[in-house]
């Protein structure tokens, strides 16, 4: 680049960072205005302005091939290919799973705001990516012997969330995309049915392999699709893995690169699986200090020290996912349960801490955090 071009690019980045900073600060102001008497409702709303800002972040990344972090096992020299050749539908946004949930986010925003300013561009990108040809290549990739554990279970879960979003949309173009995606979604469902009966122990990490999260979105998909086999599997595995859990060591959280709370993501699964009488009993045994906001390490937002570091910025995602878990767990407890208020207040603190940093100006967080923010702001507590 010439000197003048470099200066122009720097000025553009500064202007973009300033505008996104102002936008996300407005989210903080909305959070501060939230009245505690409405604590069971979403503390922040997703309006058209917010939707546009989130959409622009995803649109910027979904067609961006590099930098790219492939989860690709080479069986030979012929397998060394560019990301767009390996994954013609989901090559952007740094990695496969972020691309998948970036597509989900755009669909969610398009369904909520069909006349969004970015709607035309959203449809153009989705139509270019979610073709039958592209998704056939994606499905064939899953058929490789070396790809058996590919994106298990985090990417699987988001793929089913994408399929669920498409399947529930009465839109002519959306129906074509849903049809194109169905063979890949069917493969992922089979992967769940084949793998989880063999996994004897849950993975309780705060990152991608987390078992509870993988089962959570699979449960949502299965219920929406009327898939009784997958529903039964998730319910049986959830009870097997987590049904007897008590006195969870939540004071050990967070891990330094977590974007899930192993404690809360497990409870968010169990409130789906257990009935309204059973879940409060399980939760009281599982996290007995919740009514007092204890342990404090779980109820206070995590601190992020460097948003240019792809591992440390995970903690912004942790604050967002903690917020959606706490809201939904609280909604699953009886009104008189003393843990509700502590969970709702902490959810607001976590949301406020994270939303201002979804657009940090660095791709380390910007390629994925907006999806977490949209899920938090658009998913109704208790769903």
Language-model-detected regions and their locations in the chain:
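Long, repeat-rich segments with strong aromatic
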Residues: 225-362
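Bacterial N-terminal signal peptides
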Residues: 19-32
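Acidic, carboxylate-rich catalytic segments that either coordinate divalent cations
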Residues: 346, 353, 357-383
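Well-ordered alpha-helical scaffold segments within catalytic/enzyme domains
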Residues: 41-46, 56-60, 100-116, 157-173, ...
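Low-complexity, Ser/Thr/Pro/Gly-enriched N-terminal "stalk/linker" regions
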Residues: 41-91
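Solvent-exposed loop and edge beta-strand segments that line ligand/cofactor-binding
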Residues: 42-48, 83-100, 140-157, 198-211, ...
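N-terminal secretory signal peptides that target proteins for export/translocation
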Residues: 1-16
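Extended ligand-binding groove/face enriched in aromatic
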Residues: 100, 109-222
């Amino acid at each position: 680049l010439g000197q003048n071009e470099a200066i122009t690019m720097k000025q553009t980045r500064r202007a973009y960072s300033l505008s996104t900073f102002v936008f996300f600060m407005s989210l903080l102001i909305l959070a501060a205005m939230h009245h505690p008497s409405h604590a069971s409702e979403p503390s922040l709303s997703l309006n058209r302005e917010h939707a546009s800002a989130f959409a622009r972040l995803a649109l910027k990344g979904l067609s961006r091939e590099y930098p790219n972090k492939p989860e690709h096992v080479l069986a030979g020299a012929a397998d060394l290919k560019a990301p767009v050749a390996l994954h013609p539908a989901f090559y952007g946004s740094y990695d496969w799973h972020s691309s998948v949930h970036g597509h989900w986010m755009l669909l969610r925003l398009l369904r909520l705001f069909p006349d969004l300013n970015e709607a035309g561009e959203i449809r153009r990108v989705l139509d270019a990516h979610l073709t039958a040809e592209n998704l056939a290549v994606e499905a064939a990739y899953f058929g490789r012997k070396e790809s058996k554990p590919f994106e298990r279970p985090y990417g699987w879960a988001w793929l089913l969330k994408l399929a669920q979003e498409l399947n529930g949309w009465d839109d002519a173009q959306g129906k074509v995309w849903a049809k194109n995606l169905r063979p890949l979604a069917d493969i992922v469902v089979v992967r769940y049915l084949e793998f989880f009966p063999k996994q004897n122990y849950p993975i309780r990490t705060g990152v991608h392999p987390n078992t509870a999260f993988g089962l959570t979105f699979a449960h949502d998909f299965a219920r929406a699709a009327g898939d009784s086999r997958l529903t039964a599997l998730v319910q049986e595995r959830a009870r097997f893995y987590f049904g007897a859990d008590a006195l969870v060591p939540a004071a050990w959280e967070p891990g330094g690169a977590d974007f899930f709370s192993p404690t809360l993501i497990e409870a968010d699964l169990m409130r789906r699986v257990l009935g309204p009488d059973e879940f409060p009993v399980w939760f009281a045994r599982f996290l007995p200090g919740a009514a007092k906001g204890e342990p404090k390490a779980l109820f206070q937002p995590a601190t992020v020290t460097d948003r240019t570091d792809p591992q440390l910025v995970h903690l912004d995602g942790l604050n967002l996912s903690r917020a959606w878990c706490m809201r939904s767990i609280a909604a699953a407890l009886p009104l008189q349960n003393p843990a509700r208020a502590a969970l709702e207040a902490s959810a607001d603190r976590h949301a406020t801490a994270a939303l201002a940093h979804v657009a940090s100006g660095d791709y380390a967080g910007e390629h994925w955090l907006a999806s977490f923010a949209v899920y938090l702001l658009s998913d109704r507590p208790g769903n």
